[in-house]
Amino acid sequence: MIKKIFITGILLIVILLFVRPKYKLGMIPENPRLEKIICRQLEKNELTEEDLLNVDHLFVNGKYGRVKTLVGIERLKNLEILSIYPGKMISLEPITNLTKLTAIGIARRNKLTDLQLIGQITTLTDISLRDMPNIDISFLENLRNLNDIYIADCGITNIDCLKNLNPEEVHLWNNNIESLPDLSNWTKIKKLDLSGNPITKNRDIVDENGDVYMSYFKKDLE
């Protein structure tokens, strides 16, 4: 009896590991790989138009589907949060059609080299970029509604494009920032973390942990 139960258990594990669900695709014919990811997230084998409208967050994991583009994502008309980690992504089009998007996160060495389209999504309040070496973040200057900014392990050398924004939290871990621009416009700032950066100028405003003394901003406001 015990042997029979053991064998049955092994068979169930094998089935769970190797039998993949069969998806009935067709709602996003131009990008079936993206549709599969949505099916997996919603735990459904087939999507309806209502399902697409109910998706308010999407996690595009490169381990599933190897999505290279976001073509068809505009069908998710109520999408608010988009995470891409990691993957083969080479293009963000047509991301600018996501009119309700408020947060985006991209990480782990995607093949994306041009993030300028993100600069057109003025509804964004949160952005996270991690492990994206040598990216150009100049597009951030257009995102005046950003409250939280996370940029880590991206090799950026300056944050001049952020000086005219007014964020609440900025985390810039492990980059190559050596100096800071005038940040007197940051009247709402609560946290600025520069740990892991070779700050050479304005060193007097950064403590040993890489945190900027908030008194620096208060002084600018007096």
What is the role of each PLM region?
Residues 1, 20, 43-46, 209-210, ...:
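Short, flexible coil/linker elements and helix-boundary hinge sites characteristic
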Residues 1-12:
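N-terminal Sec-pathway targeting helices
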Residues 11-19:
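Hydrophobic h-region of N-terminal signal peptides that target proteins for export
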Residues 22-42, 46:
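Surface-exposed cap/linker segments adjacent to membranes
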Residues 47-51:
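Short boundary motifs at domain starts and secondary-structure transition points
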Residues 53-117, 123-139, 145-157, 161-178, ...:
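Concave beta-strand-loop units of leucine-rich repeat
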